[in-house]
């Protein structure tokens, strides 16, 4: 018995495939008589576009400007990130690639304020945020962490509590330090519906009990709102 949602693995390993969707039986099919497109349609319940045609990007103005940026290492005396310079512009996705353990994590920590840099500058929308507080950065910057359990969620909090982790202090959600429960619930309900975050008890679901994919969707919803 092989359980997976990865189409390539299913097609390579299985002779027959039974699809469940939302806990209900959808159908059984021989893999030799089907393809990834048909399987994905059965799994999701609608036609799925497996290949995306991308038109050429036309980047705009600089949004994130990083110059001669360095972040110290916790393991040794050398910098984990040393003298890095790059610019990310509006309308583009900039990828920084590398094998795990080669400074990518420390770079993110430095940019988001989780670690103090040892040199260089960071500008966001023209404003120097090199030494800005995390809350100040959060007004213009979103962070979807590589480790959702370590930096993305408080696992023993409810879904609605996690949705306002970075905004609970706003007058929309509190009054003189007292949380406005109805406002938090309404806000969380909206994000859950908009981003199709599935959980057993909706906004009062404990984050730890959710599937990894829905935990990730909750983080994306919070950060992109």
Task: Mark where each language-model region is.
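Glycine-rich phosphate-binding loops of nucleotide-dependent enzymes
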Residues: 1-225
